[in-house]
Regions:
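Short, Lys/Arg-enriched N-terminal segments with co-localized hydrophobic residues
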Residues: 4-15
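Glycine-rich hexapeptide-repeat left-handed beta-helix
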Residues: 13-27, 32, 60-68, 74-76, ...
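Compact, Lys/Arg-rich rRNA/RNP-binding cores from ribosome-related proteins
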Residues: 37
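N-terminal glycine-rich anion-binding loops that anchor highly charged ligand groups
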Residues: 40-46
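Intrinsically disordered, low-complexity repeat regions of secreted/extracellular protein precursors
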Residues: 195-196, 201, 206
Length: 210
Protein backbone atom coordinates (compact mmCIF):
# COMPACT_ATOMS: atom_id res chain seq x y z
CA UNK A 1 0.00 0.00 0.00
CA UNK A 2 1.38 3.42 -0.95
CA UNK A 3 1.75 6.00 1.81
CA UNK A 4 2.35 9.60 0.77
CA UNK A 5 3.09 12.69 2.87
CA UNK A 6 0.94 15.76 2.33
CA UNK A 7 3.41 17.10 -0.26
CA UNK A 8 2.66 14.21 -2.62
CA UNK A 9 -1.07 14.49 -1.98
CA UNK A 10 -0.87 18.08 -3.25
CA UNK A 11 0.88 16.86 -6.40
CA UNK A 12 -1.91 14.33 -6.90
CA UNK A 13 -4.42 17.17 -6.71
CA UNK A 14 -2.49 18.98 -9.43
CA UNK A 15 -2.64 15.75 -11.49
CA UNK A 16 1.13 15.73 -11.94
CA UNK A 17 1.42 12.40 -10.13
CA UNK A 18 -1.45 10.15 -11.09
CA UNK A 19 -2.58 6.58 -11.47
CA UNK A 20 -3.28 4.80 -14.75
CA UNK A 21 -5.62 1.83 -15.00
CA UNK A 22 -5.68 1.54 -11.25
CA UNK A 23 -1.90 1.54 -10.75
CA UNK A 24 -0.48 4.50 -8.85
CA UNK A 25 3.15 5.59 -8.65
CA UNK A 26 5.05 4.27 -5.63
CA UNK A 27 7.28 7.07 -4.40
CA UNK A 28 9.55 6.67 -1.39
CA UNK A 29 8.82 9.09 1.43
CA UNK A 30 12.43 10.33 1.27
CA UNK A 31 12.34 10.92 -2.51
CA UNK A 32 11.80 14.32 -4.10
CA UNK A 33 9.56 14.89 -7.11
CA UNK A 34 9.46 18.42 -8.48
CA UNK A 35 5.94 19.87 -8.79
CA UNK A 36 6.39 20.32 -12.55
CA UNK A 37 7.37 16.68 -13.16
CA UNK A 38 4.75 14.27 -14.52
CA UNK A 39 4.77 10.75 -13.05
CA UNK A 40 2.07 8.39 -14.32
CA UNK A 41 1.10 4.81 -13.56
CA UNK A 42 3.47 1.97 -12.71
CA UNK A 43 6.47 4.04 -11.64
CA UNK A 44 8.60 3.37 -8.55
CA UNK A 45 10.96 6.03 -7.21
CA UNK A 46 13.45 4.75 -4.63
CA UNK A 47 14.72 6.22 -1.38
CA UNK A 48 16.53 9.57 -1.60
CA UNK A 49 16.09 9.70 -5.37
CA UNK A 50 15.03 12.86 -7.18
CA UNK A 51 12.91 13.70 -10.22
CA UNK A 52 13.57 17.24 -11.40
CA UNK A 53 11.59 19.93 -13.29
CA UNK A 54 9.65 18.93 -16.40
CA UNK A 55 10.61 15.26 -16.29
CA UNK A 56 8.03 12.85 -17.69
CA UNK A 57 7.99 9.27 -16.38
CA UNK A 58 5.09 7.49 -18.06
CA UNK A 59 4.50 3.95 -16.82
CA UNK A 60 1.36 3.32 -18.83
CA UNK A 61 2.46 0.19 -20.72
CA UNK A 62 4.67 -1.45 -18.09
CA UNK A 63 6.87 -0.79 -15.06
CA UNK A 64 9.42 1.97 -14.66
CA UNK A 65 11.74 1.29 -11.72
CA UNK A 66 14.06 3.97 -10.35
CA UNK A 67 16.44 2.82 -7.62
CA UNK A 68 17.82 4.64 -4.57
CA UNK A 69 19.89 7.86 -4.65
CA UNK A 70 19.28 8.26 -8.38
CA UNK A 71 18.64 11.63 -10.02
CA UNK A 72 16.50 12.11 -13.12
CA UNK A 73 17.34 15.61 -14.23
CA UNK A 74 15.36 18.35 -15.95
CA UNK A 75 13.38 17.65 -19.15
CA UNK A 76 14.23 13.94 -19.32
CA UNK A 77 11.67 11.46 -20.67
CA UNK A 78 11.18 7.91 -19.37
CA UNK A 79 8.88 5.56 -21.27
CA UNK A 80 8.68 1.98 -22.52
CA UNK A 81 6.88 -0.44 -24.81
CA UNK A 82 4.73 -3.31 -23.57
CA UNK A 83 6.88 -6.21 -22.39
CA UNK A 84 10.06 -4.15 -22.28
CA UNK A 85 10.45 -2.65 -18.79
CA UNK A 86 12.55 0.38 -17.95
CA UNK A 87 14.87 -0.23 -15.00
CA UNK A 88 17.27 2.30 -13.51
CA UNK A 89 19.55 1.17 -10.69
CA UNK A 90 20.92 2.84 -7.58
CA UNK A 91 23.15 5.93 -7.59
CA UNK A 92 22.53 6.64 -11.27
CA UNK A 93 22.83 10.17 -12.64
CA UNK A 94 20.56 10.86 -15.61
CA UNK A 95 21.49 14.23 -17.10
CA UNK A 96 19.25 16.90 -18.57
CA UNK A 97 17.03 16.11 -21.58
CA UNK A 98 17.85 12.40 -21.68
CA UNK A 99 15.46 9.90 -23.30
CA UNK A 100 15.35 6.43 -21.72
CA UNK A 101 13.03 4.00 -23.49
CA UNK A 102 12.61 0.40 -22.34
CA UNK A 103 16.24 -0.03 -21.30
CA UNK A 104 18.21 -1.18 -18.25
CA UNK A 105 20.67 1.11 -16.51
CA UNK A 106 22.69 -0.71 -13.86
CA UNK A 107 24.01 0.86 -10.63
CA UNK A 108 26.46 3.80 -10.53
CA UNK A 109 26.08 4.84 -14.18
CA UNK A 110 26.17 8.36 -15.58
CA UNK A 111 24.01 9.21 -18.58
CA UNK A 112 25.15 12.47 -20.19
CA UNK A 113 23.02 15.40 -21.28
CA UNK A 114 20.82 14.70 -24.27
CA UNK A 115 21.69 11.01 -24.57
CA UNK A 116 19.12 8.56 -25.98
CA UNK A 117 18.98 4.91 -24.92
CA UNK A 118 16.54 2.66 -26.75
CA UNK A 119 14.56 -0.54 -26.14
CA UNK A 120 16.43 -3.55 -24.83
CA UNK A 121 19.74 -1.76 -24.35
CA UNK A 122 21.68 -2.52 -21.17
CA UNK A 123 24.19 -0.14 -19.62
CA UNK A 124 26.61 -2.04 -17.37
CA UNK A 125 27.45 -1.06 -13.81
CA UNK A 126 29.50 2.12 -13.55
CA UNK A 127 29.41 2.86 -17.28
CA UNK A 128 29.18 6.35 -18.76
CA UNK A 129 27.15 7.33 -21.82
CA UNK A 130 28.56 10.60 -23.18
CA UNK A 131 26.36 13.62 -23.83
CA UNK A 132 24.40 13.45 -27.07
CA UNK A 133 25.09 9.76 -27.67
CA UNK A 134 22.61 7.23 -29.04
CA UNK A 135 22.63 3.71 -27.62
CA UNK A 136 20.86 1.51 -30.15
CA UNK A 137 18.20 -1.11 -29.45
CA UNK A 138 19.49 -4.23 -27.66
CA UNK A 139 23.03 -2.81 -27.39
CA UNK A 140 25.19 -3.93 -24.47
CA UNK A 141 27.50 -1.38 -22.86
CA UNK A 142 30.22 -3.07 -20.77
CA UNK A 143 30.59 -2.17 -17.10
CA UNK A 144 32.83 0.79 -16.21
CA UNK A 145 33.18 1.79 -19.87
CA UNK A 146 32.79 5.19 -21.52
CA UNK A 147 30.76 5.08 -24.72
CA UNK A 148 30.01 7.93 -27.09
CA UNK A 149 28.75 8.70 -30.55
CA UNK A 150 25.81 7.92 -32.83
CA UNK A 151 25.59 5.01 -32.49
CA UNK A 152 27.50 4.90 -29.20
CA UNK A 153 30.72 2.89 -29.22
CA UNK A 154 33.19 2.05 -26.44
CA UNK A 155 36.05 4.55 -26.12
CA UNK A 156 37.93 3.65 -22.95
CA UNK A 157 37.52 2.44 -19.35
CA UNK A 158 36.09 4.83 -16.77
CA UNK A 159 38.95 5.89 -14.49
CA UNK A 160 38.88 5.59 -10.68
CA UNK A 161 39.11 9.39 -10.49
CA UNK A 162 36.01 9.73 -12.65
CA UNK A 163 34.16 7.17 -10.57
CA UNK A 164 34.99 9.13 -7.41
CA UNK A 165 33.81 12.37 -9.02
CA UNK A 166 30.55 10.78 -10.13
CA UNK A 167 29.98 9.45 -6.61
CA UNK A 168 30.37 13.00 -5.30
CA UNK A 169 27.81 14.13 -7.87
CA UNK A 170 25.36 11.54 -6.58
CA UNK A 171 25.89 12.76 -3.02
CA UNK A 172 25.40 16.36 -4.15
CA UNK A 173 22.04 15.59 -5.74
CA UNK A 174 20.84 13.62 -2.72
CA UNK A 175 21.66 16.59 -0.49
CA UNK A 176 20.18 19.14 -2.89
CA UNK A 177 16.97 17.13 -3.23
CA UNK A 178 16.61 17.03 0.55
CA UNK A 179 16.77 20.84 0.64
CA UNK A 180 14.17 21.17 -2.12
CA UNK A 181 11.90 18.69 -0.37
CA UNK A 182 12.20 20.44 2.99
CA UNK A 183 11.41 23.82 1.44
CA UNK A 184 8.41 22.40 -0.41
CA UNK A 185 7.06 20.81 2.75
CA UNK A 186 7.62 24.02 4.71
CA UNK A 187 5.73 26.02 2.10
CA UNK A 188 2.91 23.48 2.17
CA UNK A 189 2.75 23.61 5.98
CA UNK A 190 2.60 27.41 5.88
CA UNK A 191 -0.19 27.30 3.32
CA UNK A 192 -2.13 24.76 5.38
CA UNK A 193 -1.75 26.92 8.49
CA UNK A 194 -2.94 29.99 6.60
CA UNK A 195 -5.97 28.12 5.25
CA UNK A 196 -6.81 26.87 8.74
CA UNK A 197 -6.56 30.39 10.19
CA UNK A 198 -8.72 31.76 7.39
CA UNK A 199 -11.35 29.08 8.00
CA UNK A 200 -11.35 29.79 11.75
CA UNK A 201 -11.76 33.50 11.09
CA UNK A 202 -14.68 32.83 8.77
CA UNK A 203 -16.39 30.72 11.44
CA UNK A 204 -15.83 33.45 14.05
CA UNK A 205 -17.22 36.15 11.77
CA UNK A 206 -20.26 34.03 11.01
CA UNK A 207 -20.86 33.49 14.74
CA UNK A 208 -20.63 37.24 15.42
CA UNK A 209 -23.10 37.97 12.65
CA UNK A 210 -25.68 35.87 14.46
Amino acid sequence: MNVYPRFFIVLYKLKMIRSFRGIAPNIAVSAYVDPSAVVIGDVTVGAHSSVWPNVTARGDTGPIRIGAETSIQDNSVLHLDEGIPLTIGDRVTVGHSVVLHGCTIEDDCLIGIGAIILNGARIGKGAVVAAGSLVAENAEVPAATLVMGVPAKPKRPVTPEEQARFAEGVKHYVEKAAVYKAEAQQAEASQAAAEKAEASQAVAEKAEAR
